Amino acid sequence: MADITDIKSIMYTEKSLQIQESGVLVVQTSPKVSKNQLKEVFKEYFGFTPVRVNSLRQAGKIKRFRGVEGKRASFKKFYVKLPEGAKIESLAV
């Protein structure tokens, strides 16, 4: 089962702030979290079940510095549609 610690961060990009107005929250998690586990986390910790959850895997970028090649970590991104009137006060911008 997933825990609240599996949510790495809330993404604040131009796109995520635009769709946040329509009640969609963009969440970055570890790649092992599933849609159902994320729904359970929202129900347990925030007191509501999301209307819809869409997910995608984001591959880590290859970065080079002074001839040494490295890779950023891969992550999973979720688009969580909140129910009408639901707010998460601690995550407000």
From Swiss-Prot:
InterPro entries: Nucleotide-bd_a/b_plait_sf, Ribosomal_uL23-like, Ribosomal_uL23/eL15/eS24_sf. The keyword RNA-binding applies. GO terms for biological process: translation. Pfam families: Ribosomal_L23. Gene3D superfamilies: 3.30.70.330. The keyword Ribosomal protein applies. Keywords: Ribonucleoprotein, Ribosomal protein, RNA-binding, rRNA-binding. One of its GO terms (molecular function) is structural constituent of ribosome. One of its GO terms (cellular component) is ribosome. Part of the 50S ribosomal subunit. Contacts protein L29, and trigger factor when it is bound to the ribosome. Belongs to the universal ribosomal protein uL23 family. One of the early assembly proteins it binds 23S rRNA. One of the proteins that surrounds the polypeptide exit tunnel on the outside of the ribosome. Forms the main docking site for trigger factor binding to the ribosome. This is Large ribosomal subunit protein uL23. It comes from Wolinella succinogenes (strain ATCC 29543 / DSM 1740 / CCUG 13145 / JCM 31913 / LMG 7466 / NCTC 11488 / FDC 602W) (Vibrio succinogenes). The gene is rplW.
